[in-house]
């Protein structure tokens, strides 16, 4: 049991207001994807309305639990950011770390965002919540620590949250991701889903093409026929999160991840279409809703650093923002659990660690909503860097050893993952979505 004790208040900081906020410039080239979208919440606040809105960003304060000093600059190096979607359903949209009333809050969505050294490429990999992983011992802010265990991935967040605060939950997920991947995570962002919903409402809703029938009366109450739908924030959130009652779906997390990635892209394109980043009045309301939904690590709570990072990404091309999902297969001991296909995952991890292009054969969804397979090198920094990866490499246990028998039931067909369980091809679905978004 660790003797390291600190109160929650020591971990939960607020960004101080600037004495002289900068005059708001017009951002001429808006960021063009859901990932950078998360960063743009804080970026826009820092550049445009910092004196009022920056106090709404929650500072995680996790460095002392990780035993690290926050980085003082992002210049000249690649960056790996852990993004966690909070599964707290307590009804409070903007929980702070000091009043979190859900001690077993779970991570509903987890992604690693890799920003290349030259800022020309952003790759985002989603980690299924049902993936069985090795969860290391995690120190909590109340002085306790957990035992190492093998369990479902999103348990890491729950195990950490038993310390009574979000910092402990994030750190346990952070350490689990590093152990799984060998990637050194630099920063983290936790997104409260209630804030996600309110931001969609600030857009006036979004248009989504639903490719297949959904009837989930027992869980979400969602009932949808195929076709173009206009969703408010609550409806869009329910659609992004639904797992059961989706025609053609096995109820796994893979198809839900694909829907979430698609909805984030739709949300960002809607913001661009409505000129949210060039109209100060609209930006104020839009960003104001988003900032309260974010809890960030110390490096991202620095407005000067975050502004510089966000500004350096303003020329990012949508084609160079790529979403992908880890290659997994059905666990032989439980059809509702997943195991990592390590041989297929290793080249993906290596591309993040060395800041090199994604490997050929990986299917991705780009910032324009198009699904494609990597056939040649994508633009990125070509010079491998010393990313100071954790000393513990991903472990291979008997439970994760790959064999032809174990992988006979792949959960994710890399050539079909963009179809979202419909009879439509990824290309057909992308075209229908474009037409749907074009409607008023």
Q: Locations of the language-model features?
A:
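Non-catalytic, solvent-exposed segments at the cell envelope interface
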Residues: 2-440
């Amino acid at each position: 049991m660790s003797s390291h004790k600190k109160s929650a208040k020591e971990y939960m900081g607020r960004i101080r207001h600037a004495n002289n906020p900068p005059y708001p410039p017009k951002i001429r080239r808006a960021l063009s994807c859901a990932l950078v979208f998360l960063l743009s919440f804080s970026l826009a606040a820092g550049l445009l309305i910092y004196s009022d809105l920056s106090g709404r960003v929650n500072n995680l304060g996790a460095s002392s639990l990780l035993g690290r000093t926050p980085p003082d600059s992002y210049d000249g190096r690649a960056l790996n950011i852990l993004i966690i979607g909070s599964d707290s359903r307590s009804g409070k949209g903007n929980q702070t770390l000091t009043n979190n009333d859900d001690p077993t809050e779970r991570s509903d969505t987890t992604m690693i965002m890799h920003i290349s050294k030259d800022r020309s490429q952003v790759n985002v990999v989603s980690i299924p919540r049902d993936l069985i992983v090795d969860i290391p011992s995690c120190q909590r802010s109340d002085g306790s620590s957990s035992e190492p265990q093998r369990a479902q991935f999103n348990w890491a967040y729950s195990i950490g949250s038993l310390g009574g605060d979000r910092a402990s939950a994030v750190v346990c997920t952070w350490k689990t991701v590093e152990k799984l991947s060998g990637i050194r995570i630099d920063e983290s962002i936790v997104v409260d889903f209630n804030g996600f919903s309110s931001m969609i409402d600030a857009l006036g809703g979004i248009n989504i093409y639903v490719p297949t029938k959904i009837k989930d009366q027992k869980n979400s109450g969602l009932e949808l026929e195929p076709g173009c739908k206009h969703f408010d924030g609550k409806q869009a959130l329910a659609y992004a999160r639904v797992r059961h009652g989706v025609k053609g779906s096995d109820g796994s997390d893979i198809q839900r991840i694909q829907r979430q990635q698609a909805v984030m892209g739709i949300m960002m394109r809607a913001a661009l279409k409505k000129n949210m980043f060039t109209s100060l009045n609209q930006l104020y309301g839009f960003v104001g809703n988003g900032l309260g939904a974010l809890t960030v690590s110390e490096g991202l709570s620095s407005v000067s650093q975050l502004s510089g990072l966000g500004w350096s990404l303003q020329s990012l091309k949508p084609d160079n923002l790529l979403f992908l999902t880890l290659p997994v297969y059905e666990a032989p001991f439980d059809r509702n659990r997943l195991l990592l296909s390590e041989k297929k995952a290793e080249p993906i991890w290596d591309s993040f660690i060395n800041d090199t292009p994604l490997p050929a054969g990986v299917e991705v969804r780009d910032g324009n909503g198009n699904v494609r397979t990597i056939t040649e090198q994508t633009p990125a920094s070509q010079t491998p860097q010393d990313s100071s990866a954790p000393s513990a490499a991903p472990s291979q246990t008997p439970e994760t050893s790959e064999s032809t028998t174990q992988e006979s039931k792949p959960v994710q067909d890399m050539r079909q993952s963009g179809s979202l369980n419909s009879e439509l091809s990824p290309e057909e679905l992308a075209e229908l979505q474009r037409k749907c978004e074009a409607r008023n």
